[in-house]
């Protein structure tokens, strides 16, 4: 008797469509037999990582690598707390932000009668993880201009709402919600409802924000802010994210965390990277210049794009995006089609170096003209 293992998991898992990351350079090289490839698909830092982080990795001792990590006792905790102007007991270190979302769902929504609330075109991992745990998830429609209507989220929230997930700025649209609206949301929702504010792209948008969301933690203990070293710090390959929240929430997360979830290399690199303000400023400068470069190129071609406060632009192909996506692949350029978000006519492109942006725009012109 043969066993159909596909039928053994619960319905939530059986119904899932796996998260598909941006195609890798290695994968495209193998598929197409080409070597001159640029990747503008996953919102990684085209400058690489901080030189200070790289130096810290290169000078690590073999003994340090051979021992199990102890993130809560690592100097990174106090250093990061000081940098953020919070207390160490308000921090939770994680293997990327995705694990943070999973552990929050496990702690505050699983095996309860509560549901999750987000909005259309939000980061797909929220729904994937909620569905994998069979936690009901409700999604609020967004406006025609791709902006999130906070009033609609307030109206959709009730005492049975366990967690609200909002990315600010949002991925994959890049749209920023003003802090006054986030504050209004916090003031309106039940105090038993967690607001998880995913700020993976915070550093790119910080200059546009009038208030740091961390300033609200004392007044609103149901606020959880998540950030990452993957984007501006260029450490996506090391997987290090963190949450800032009320110590009582952090204490719950620590009870159920997997052991040794953050590795030694990531801890050492992050400890060094925090000091590298020159790298951060260089990354921001390159991103601002690249954003202007791509916007000018889109305008020249009359291509519509969404306003972005991130390190990417999402643009409208006005037809199914796969033809352009495949054309770019043939030319050694990896971007991100957004069919997984039911945005079939849209592509998201990461802001690259000046040379990478020029190559992308040239290919775009050749396709359309």
UniProtKB/Swiss-Prot annotation:
Reported cofactor(s): pyridoxal 5'-phosphate
Keyword Repeat: no
Domain of life according to the entry: Bacteria
Pfam families with a match to the protein in the record: Aminotran_1_2
InterPro entries: Aminotransferase_I/II_large, HisP_aminotrans, HistidinolP_aminotransfase, PyrdxlP-dep_Trfase, PyrdxlP-dep_Trfase_major, PyrdxlP-dep_Trfase_small
Gene Ontology terms: biological process: L-histidine biosynthetic process
Organism whose genome encodes this protein: Legionella pneumophila (strain Lens)
Catalytic reaction annotation: L-histidinol phosphate + 2-oxoglutarate = 3-(imidazol-4-yl)-2-oxopropyl phosphate + L-glutamate
Gene: hisC2
Protein name as catalogued: Histidinol-phosphate aminotransferase 2
Documented EC number(s): 2.6.1.9
Complexes and interactors: Homodimer.
Record flagged with keyword Amino-acid biosynthesis: yes
In-chain residues carrying the UniProt-annotated modification N6-(pyridoxal phosphate)lysine: 231
Protein family per UniProt: Belongs to the class-II pyridoxal-phosphate-dependent aminotransferase family. Histidinol-phosphate aminotransferase subfamily.
Pathways per UniProt: Amino-acid biosynthesis; L-histidine biosynthesis; L-histidine from 5-phospho-alpha-D-ribose 1-diphosphate: step 7/9
GO molecular function terms listed in the Swiss-Prot or TrEMBL record: histidinol-phosphate transaminase activity; pyridoxal phosphate binding
Keyword entries, A-Z: Amino-acid biosynthesis, Aminotransferase, Histidine biosynthesis, Pyridoxal phosphate, Transferase
